[in-house]
Amino acid sequence: MTDPKRIVLNDDGWIVSQIMTPVTTAVLKERIVDTYVDSGLDTLSWCMGDTGRQRYETLDILAQPNYLPQGRENDLAAQNLRRLIDSDGGPVTIFTKLCHEIGLKFLPSVRMNSHYDRAVADDVGSIRQDHPEYLLGQADEEFVSNTTQWGIRTGLDYARPEVRSHVVALVIDLFERFDTDGVELDFMRHPAFFRVDEAYGSRHLITDMLRRIRARMDEVSASSGRDLEILVRVPPTLADSARIGLDVETWIREGIVDTVAAGGGFIPLHAPVEEFVEAAQGTDCQILGAIESLRPATEEESVNAIASRLYEGGASGLYLFNFWHKSADWKRRVLNVLTDPDHLSRATKRYEMEYMERLAPNDLHSYAFRYAVPPVQLPVGLGFNLTGRGTVLSLTIGDDIERAAADGEIAWCTLELGFSDISAEDEIEVLVNGVPLPSETATRRFGTWSRQEWTKFPDRLAEVDYDGGVIEYELDGPPFRKGENEIEVRTIMRTVMKGAILSLRHVELQIEYDG
């Protein structure tokens, strides 16, 4: 029997500002904590705000009875925060108690930066309002619109010692004054901390800041007997982390952090979790693979596939973001599968390769995401290569298809490719690990095809149409293997006088087991 995997789930604090029902301790218990009973969840992290504005019982708020921020007397979040403080001490106090009562660990989560649009943000926190000189872009500076530096200009600049001191005090308060199990530092909300041209050379500054937090945590742990944890969520590669000023390898090597959630969950199949696992070899640092509730990870089959791939890469568990909205039934059903690798190995899976359109900037925060997340393989243009070799894509899977097929355990397995600007006259050849797929048994559909895409966060899903076609292969004795696989797509014949480039936009492998 394989050891169970650890699951950490982040709740973004939605309930304080998003429901009309007055938020009380009973509501937090019923709507949040109790939904994880018997789910297999190990740790709940709850967003208490960011480094600019907080929604918990800070010392400043506690010192002002009946206080509501000026101009926010009718603000739901402010009213609910005041109510929770006056009744039972406040959100961090309440969540710590409720989680411990059902055997969950609790980590308050700090969003390490935010890049607000000044034109629409009504509350960006006093540090930004009182000290605009602490921001990544100064009021008298002009940036070229829609560039990375323009997009991150409203975030706090960690090159300023005042900013780092402010963050240290905020973070230490969360494990020093409360009976929490440590703290989560979420560097993926939102991942820009220095000016673009200064970030790599400034990475020692955040490392120094974390050393200070680690030192104080060790002191608190020694004096209280509590087992405290620093969990960090970082970009999906070590190189991208370092490029934006986060020296994750040093944090792991020096024991500054206990757990690393690798990636924001935007490209979980493509993210090289293996390099984090390798960096943690010989240390006590735990590596979690990150999944966010974005397409394709909105459906159980896709979540199963991503988890299987991350475990294949050596992850000791998962970090789930924006799955708080799922029902208690979903959490019990799905999370218990994810914690059990043996059960997961036989679960239905859909491996859907990520595509670049999902990372297109549409607000200031998304510029930071695009800044920290590397490009992926789709979409890709298909042409006539001079060497005769086709376009090659890599897909890593966690399923031992070869063994399962040999044992007669696979009910069906299909590979689906979606193209734009393809027609019935075009001839395509597909090879998997050098084995040609039988084109004569493939199913072809031409015309408009669609898929669900997260077109603009947080506007939910929408059907996006493509003019082209889909080719689907039913795989009997699938040539896929556990680990990395090579999918080669060759253009054999193209429609005469067709000017548009043939583009591969969608690759999906589905596996269902017998029993």
Question: Which residues make up each language-model segment?
Answer:
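Beta-strand-rich ligand-recognition modules
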Residues: 420-515
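Extended extracellular/luminal ectodomain segments enriched in beta-structured repeat modules
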Residues: 403-414, 423
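Aromatic-lined carbohydrate-binding/catalytic grooves of carbohydrate-active enzymes
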Residues: 41-86, 192-196, 262-276
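Catalytic domains of carbohydrate-active enzymes, especially glycoside hydrolases
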Residues: 27-57, 177-182, 257-262, 312-317
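Aromatic- and carboxylate-lined catalytic core of secreted/periplasmic carbohydrate-active enzymes
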Residues: 316-405
